[in-house]
Amino acid sequence: MKLIMKTKFKTGQYICIKWRPVESLIPTPLGFMYSSKNESTYGVWKIEPYKFGGIDYKMRLVPVGESAKIFFPMDRYTSDYSDLPDEMIFDDQSLAEKFVKEFLID
């Protein structure tokens, strides 16, 4: 997996991206695993600094608001979102949530 190193946004901002919602939690001896739905949907994610096990991942995506009910945080992910349009990057959570509701979700 590729870690985010260079982005056009910074921690504390909110981005609107498409991801697969959690379908169910599966208990395991090491904690929980989850299965995802096959269809992706848009959500609002806050960009937070993240360091774990001595590895600096630069940032972590944490779902907020309504998105927190259907998504799990992403510590590692495969895209740097460098092609994310500026219109999908917000400094205010309520504006990001309004944008998703009005323009991205049917």
Model-identified regions with their sequence ranges:
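Short beta-strand-centered aromatic/proline hotspots
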Residues: 22-59
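Intrinsically disordered, low-complexity, charged/polar segments
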Residues: 53-106
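Generic low-complexity, intrinsically disordered sequence content enriched
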Residues: 7, 29, 34-37, 65, ...
